[in-house]
Amino acid sequence: MQVLVDADACPAVIKDMLFRAARRAEICVTLVANQFLRTPPSPFIKAVQVPAGFDVADARIVELVEAGDLVITADIPLAAAVLDKGAHALDPRGNWFSRENIEERLSTRAMMDQLRSAGIDTGGPAPFSARDGKAFASQLDRFLARHGKP
């Protein structure tokens, strides 16, 4: 089991939590981004830089992910692709993507895209909060307790 991170938009505090978890649980954490990422020295942490371009990092994550892996992303289409491969998907706010909720989330995303295309200001997500970080840490710990190294 490995953890893959859609790192371009992942909050720094979440990356730091993942770095600590990698060392503590001795699991591989791979950050994928289209920019250089500084990572702490560890045999369990690596960064993969992909060329700039629309969904290039997402495509690389889909290529690397295997059934049972965990992917950290807020990208709903990427989460859907990851679920299709039998992996798990968690957003940086501690919310799980699942077979039960992914279609609704894709539909909501499509509707919001249509509203924005029509010139309607739909706002954006709330700023990342300490509560979001705590929710993520809790879900990550639970996942690693169930699926981490034996």
Curated annotation (Swiss-Prot):
NCBIfam families cross-referenced by the UniProt entry: PRK00124.1 (NF001095)
Record-given protein name: UPF0178 protein Bcep18194_A4809
CDD domains from the UniProt entry: PIN_YqxD-like
What is the organism of origin for this protein? Burkholderia lata (strain ATCC 17760 / DSM 23089 / LMG 22485 / NCIMB 9086 / R18194 / 383)
Q: Which InterPro entries does this UniProt record tie to the protein?
A: UPF0178 (IPR003791)
User: Which family, according to the similarity comment?
Assistant: Belongs to the UPF0178 family.
